[in-house]
Curated annotation (Swiss-Prot):
Lineage: Bacteria, Pseudomonadati, Myxococcota, Myxococcia, Myxococcales
Family: Belongs to the RuvC family.
Protein name: Crossover junction endodeoxyribonuclease RuvC
Primary gene name: ruvC
Subunit field text: Homodimer which binds Holliday junction (HJ) DNA. The HJ becomes 2-fold symmetrical on binding to RuvC with unstacked arms; it has a different conformation from HJ DNA in complex with RuvA. In the full resolvosome a probable DNA-RuvA(4)-RuvB(12)-RuvC(2) complex forms which resolves the HJ.
Positions that bind Mg(2+) 1: 7, 137
UniProt cofactor(s): Mg(2+)
Keywords: Cytoplasm, DNA damage, DNA recombination, DNA repair, DNA-binding, Endonuclease, Hydrolase, Magnesium, Metal-binding, Nuclease
Main subcellular location of this protein, as a coarse class: cytoplasm
Annotated active site: 7, 66, 137
Amino acid sequence: MIVLGIDPGSRRCGYGVVAREGARLTVVESGVLVPGDLPMAQRLGRILDGLDALIARARPAEASVEAVFSGASPRSALVLGQARGVALAAAARAGLPVFEYAPSEVKLAFTGNGRAGKDQMLRTARMLLGAAPGLSDEADALAIAVCHLARRAFAVPAAGAGRAAAARAAAARLRPSRRDHRGTP
């Protein structure tokens, strides 16, 4: 299975394409889209073009995107939301199911530490994947793809390809592994 991980941003959009065969993970392609010092609409257009070309080239089966971090300032959250919208649109336009993960969930799945810093993310990318990401955005995107591959058995798509209903039905069949406070399963 090949998965595209996207760390959205309006100035730098990290991407990582990771393939899994059995327990083996291989980086297909990774990098950072840098649209330049342009007005917002043009930067977003360049990111969309870059993601479209990447999806056509790498042919991932699914996409995973980092969810919005609400601790940012309102303006930063709005700008990040626009960049996320472009990433979601590129994946949906290609017919890819899209999965979203909180930053702490990505860090926990990738490093074992939900509060990992940039240096730890870069080191883990080198150790786990043999990758040498130049920027933290690239390492984060690789981590998002790896997180999705690790969580894939229980993931429910956020958008795309009409597989959401089947995934929700499968998730509904899962039973909790512990009892609730009333002692019922």
